[in-house]
């Protein structure tokens, strides 16, 4: 579904991404993990078209820059960290409703179906208690729950998520991953994660990054064993067993 070929990116003299290549198959749930500053979010920004890819990122075999943005947005939903910039007099449902924008007819209001989808998604993702509340009175975690619901409101084929669990408590963190698991039954997920236990438990493929490079990729059980992760993050670890495999839980 997504293919990246020889993707490089630099700002001034600094190389951010260094000749990255990989493929994500349709129906997979792929995590991107690595130390802070290794380029995970930048990589996701290229896939989501927030940054130019110069014929290095392909969706269903076609370079993404040649796909009309509105058409791309109908199939690819994005949840990014920078989304916390949502401000103003907006209410919770307004944020989630924005996920239906690619389907809205020009100069027309959102349809009754759009509003029904918003309520359904807010219920399914646990965001319904926020319905009717103004954004300016919400915490970072509450805003994150809305941005997650907004992404699901697009009903995408491909879901791109940049550290969606960071501001969530344990209850909502696990609820999100279970919802992603259900979505994964009919869609494709690429997710940046710092929580290795969640990566091991829920993702079937992993891409490991360090200093702008991909140093390993493949089935999660093969690339996320405790010894490898300990060397990557340079921290003590302990073993835990998940489906008869050893992983680094931290």
PLM regions: where:
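ABC ATPase nucleotide-binding domains
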Residues: 226, 230-250
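Catalytic Walker B motif of ABC-type/P-loop ATPase nucleotide-binding domains
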Residues: 159-163
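Helix-to-loop junction immediately C-terminal to a conserved catalytic motif
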Residues: 48
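The feature captures the beta-strand-to-loop junction immediately N-terminal to the Walker
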Residues: 33-35
